[in-house]
Amino acid sequence: YLFDWLVNKYGNPLRFPARSPHNDLLHALVAVARPKQGGEEVEQKRGMTLKVVLPNRSRHKPEHYHHLSKAAKIIFTRDLKRFFRLDLTAFVLNTASKGCLTLESLEQWCKSHGIRITHRDAVKRIYYRMKKQLEEQGILLPPKFPKSLQS
């Protein structure tokens, strides 16, 4: 779901807006590329690989500063997931305040954000976790969707 949302929102390769928090974080995380050595451990890749257009900063030119360590990749992925949840939260709260949050509206949000059908169940699970967290804070969202509508 994250891959679909990112490609739909920022394109492929990912090109973030000039003064975005993503570019600021990338600027902080990139390091000078190290020459590869024969004994290095090969990194295991999970999911789909995305290319990212690095910001061009006067002190950190992308030609030299384009290495993300394993820890930096984890931090950046966590940040992207956080922005996905913020986008979903904004939609849920806006739609719920109008009183029209339904399974169809959640499906429509997924469709409009380029999330494939195979990943929509994951988005629903995120919604239910978010709903539970909001209820713990006293914000009530619509009840669970009827099982007859879930597919």
Language model features by range: what are they?
Residues Q108-R125:
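Short, basic interhelical loop/turn and adjoining N-cap
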Residues T77-K98:
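Positively charged, polyanion-binding regions of nucleic-acid-associated proteins
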Residues Y1-L68:
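Long, low-complexity interaction regions most often at the N-terminus
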